[in-house]
Protein backbone atom coordinates (compact mmCIF):
# COMPACT_ATOMS: atom_id res chain seq x y z
CA UNK A 1 0.00 0.00 0.00
CA UNK A 2 2.85 2.38 0.84
CA UNK A 3 4.45 1.76 -2.53
CA UNK A 4 1.20 2.50 -4.36
CA UNK A 5 0.72 5.76 -2.45
CA UNK A 6 4.33 6.79 -3.09
CA UNK A 7 3.97 6.08 -6.83
CA UNK A 8 0.74 8.08 -6.95
CA UNK A 9 2.33 10.99 -5.10
CA UNK A 10 5.40 10.91 -7.33
CA UNK A 11 3.35 10.84 -10.53
CA UNK A 12 1.22 13.77 -9.34
CA UNK A 13 4.26 15.86 -8.44
CA UNK A 14 5.85 15.22 -11.85
CA UNK A 15 2.68 16.17 -13.72
CA UNK A 16 2.27 19.33 -11.63
CA UNK A 17 5.79 20.45 -12.44
CA UNK A 18 5.18 19.84 -16.16
CA UNK A 19 2.14 22.13 -16.13
CA UNK A 20 4.13 24.88 -14.38
CA UNK A 21 6.89 24.85 -17.00
CA UNK A 22 4.90 26.89 -19.56
CA UNK A 23 3.98 29.61 -17.08
CA UNK A 24 7.53 29.76 -15.74
CA UNK A 25 8.94 30.25 -19.24
CA UNK A 26 6.61 33.16 -19.97
CA UNK A 27 7.29 34.73 -16.58
CA UNK A 28 11.03 34.44 -17.15
CA UNK A 29 10.76 36.22 -20.52
CA UNK A 30 8.55 38.94 -19.00
CA UNK A 31 10.92 39.42 -16.09
CA UNK A 32 13.93 39.82 -18.43
CA UNK A 33 12.08 42.39 -20.53
CA UNK A 34 10.84 44.27 -17.46
CA UNK A 35 14.30 44.23 -15.85
CA UNK A 36 15.79 45.80 -18.99
CA UNK A 37 13.06 48.46 -19.09
CA UNK A 38 13.41 49.23 -15.38
CA UNK A 39 17.19 49.50 -15.79
CA UNK A 40 16.75 51.95 -18.66
CA UNK A 41 14.21 54.03 -16.72
CA UNK A 42 16.36 54.16 -13.60
CA UNK A 43 19.50 55.38 -15.32
CA UNK A 44 21.05 52.07 -16.30
CA UNK A 45 23.07 51.40 -19.43
CA UNK A 46 20.20 49.89 -21.46
CA UNK A 47 19.49 51.73 -24.71
CA UNK A 48 16.20 52.33 -26.50
CA UNK A 49 17.19 49.77 -29.16
CA UNK A 50 17.72 47.10 -26.50
CA UNK A 51 14.53 47.90 -24.62
CA UNK A 52 12.21 48.50 -27.59
CA UNK A 53 12.68 44.99 -28.99
CA UNK A 54 10.40 43.90 -26.12
CA UNK A 55 7.73 46.53 -26.91
CA UNK A 56 4.44 45.66 -28.56
CA UNK A 57 3.84 47.00 -32.05
CA UNK A 58 1.45 49.67 -30.75
CA UNK A 59 3.89 50.86 -28.06
CA UNK A 60 6.77 51.07 -30.58
CA UNK A 61 4.62 53.35 -32.75
CA UNK A 62 3.78 55.65 -29.83
CA UNK A 63 7.12 55.63 -28.03
CA UNK A 64 10.01 56.60 -30.29
CA UNK A 65 13.64 56.84 -29.14
CA UNK A 66 13.21 60.60 -28.72
CA UNK A 67 10.05 60.17 -26.62
CA UNK A 68 11.73 57.48 -24.54
CA UNK A 69 14.62 59.84 -23.74
CA UNK A 70 12.05 62.44 -22.64
CA UNK A 71 10.42 59.85 -20.37
CA UNK A 72 13.81 58.94 -18.85
CA UNK A 73 14.60 62.61 -18.20
CA UNK A 74 11.12 63.17 -16.74
CA UNK A 75 11.50 60.25 -14.33
CA UNK A 76 14.85 61.55 -13.14
CA UNK A 77 13.57 65.14 -12.79
CA UNK A 78 10.18 64.43 -11.16
CA UNK A 79 11.02 61.38 -9.04
CA UNK A 80 14.80 61.31 -8.72
CA UNK A 81 17.38 58.57 -9.08
CA UNK A 82 15.76 55.21 -8.37
CA UNK A 83 18.00 52.56 -6.82
CA UNK A 84 17.53 49.03 -5.50
CA UNK A 85 14.55 48.02 -7.61
CA UNK A 86 12.88 44.75 -6.69
CA UNK A 87 10.07 42.78 -8.30
CA UNK A 88 7.28 42.60 -5.74
CA UNK A 89 4.20 41.44 -7.66
CA UNK A 90 3.13 39.43 -10.69
CA UNK A 91 -0.53 40.00 -11.44
CA UNK A 92 -2.36 37.95 -14.06
CA UNK A 93 -5.55 39.67 -15.24
CA UNK A 94 -8.39 37.23 -14.72
CA UNK A 95 -12.11 37.80 -15.26
CA UNK A 96 -14.52 35.38 -13.60
CA UNK A 97 -16.80 35.29 -16.65
CA UNK A 98 -14.16 35.40 -19.41
CA UNK A 99 -11.17 33.71 -17.76
CA UNK A 100 -7.54 34.71 -18.24
CA UNK A 101 -7.30 37.81 -20.46
CA UNK A 102 -3.67 37.26 -21.50
CA UNK A 103 -2.48 40.42 -19.72
CA UNK A 104 0.26 40.13 -17.10
CA UNK A 105 1.45 42.98 -14.89
CA UNK A 106 4.78 43.15 -13.09
CA UNK A 107 5.23 45.67 -10.28
CA UNK A 108 8.61 46.82 -9.01
CA UNK A 109 9.44 49.02 -6.03
CA UNK A 110 12.60 51.08 -5.86
CA UNK A 111 14.22 53.37 -3.32
CA UNK A 112 14.72 57.04 -4.17
CA UNK A 113 15.73 58.35 -0.75
CA UNK A 114 15.28 57.40 2.89
CA UNK A 115 11.59 58.28 2.91
CA UNK A 116 10.70 58.31 -0.79
CA UNK A 117 10.07 55.33 -3.02
CA UNK A 118 8.98 54.63 -6.59
CA UNK A 119 6.52 52.12 -8.01
CA UNK A 120 7.23 50.86 -11.52
CA UNK A 121 4.39 49.09 -13.29
CA UNK A 122 4.98 47.10 -16.51
CA UNK A 123 2.11 45.50 -18.46
CA UNK A 124 2.54 42.61 -20.91
CA UNK A 125 0.42 40.88 -23.53
CA UNK A 126 1.39 37.99 -25.79
CA UNK A 127 2.10 39.07 -29.38
CA UNK A 128 3.30 36.59 -32.02
CA UNK A 129 3.95 33.98 -29.35
CA UNK A 130 6.15 36.19 -27.16
CA UNK A 131 5.28 38.50 -24.24
CA UNK A 132 5.57 42.18 -25.23
CA UNK A 133 5.43 45.35 -23.12
CA UNK A 134 2.18 47.22 -23.80
CA UNK A 135 2.46 49.92 -21.13
CA UNK A 136 4.56 51.08 -18.22
CA UNK A 137 4.24 53.68 -15.49
CA UNK A 138 6.58 55.11 -12.88
CA UNK A 139 5.02 56.84 -9.89
CA UNK A 140 6.46 58.24 -6.65
CA UNK A 141 5.37 56.85 -3.29
CA UNK A 142 5.87 58.66 -0.02
CA UNK A 143 4.90 56.89 3.21
CA UNK A 144 2.17 58.48 5.26
CA UNK A 145 3.49 60.25 8.30
CA UNK A 146 1.58 59.23 11.41
CA UNK A 147 0.97 61.71 14.19
CA UNK A 148 2.63 60.80 17.49
CA UNK A 149 0.38 58.83 19.83
CA UNK A 150 -1.28 60.85 22.60
CA UNK A 151 -0.55 59.75 26.13
Over which residues does each language-model region extend?
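Residue-level signal for cytosolic alpha-helical hairpin/rod architecture
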Residues: 31-35, 52, 56, 117
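Short solvent-exposed beta->alpha transition segments
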Residues: 49-99
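Long beta-sheet-rich domains in secretory-pathway and surface-associated proteins
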Residues: 43-44, 106
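Bacterial N-terminal signal peptides
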Residues: 7-16
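Positively charged n-region of N-terminal signal peptides that target proteins for export
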Residues: 1-4
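Short, low-complexity N-terminal intrinsically disordered segments enriched in polar/charged residues
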Residues: 19-43
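Low-complexity, Gly/Pro
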Residues: 20-23, 46-49, 53, 70, ...
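Exposed beta-sheet edge and beta->alpha loop/turn motif
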Residues: 91-151
Amino acid sequence: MKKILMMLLLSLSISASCFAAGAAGRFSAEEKAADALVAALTGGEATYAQVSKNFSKALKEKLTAENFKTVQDGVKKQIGTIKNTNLVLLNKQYDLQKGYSGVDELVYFGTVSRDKFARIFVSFVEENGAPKVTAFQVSPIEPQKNAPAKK
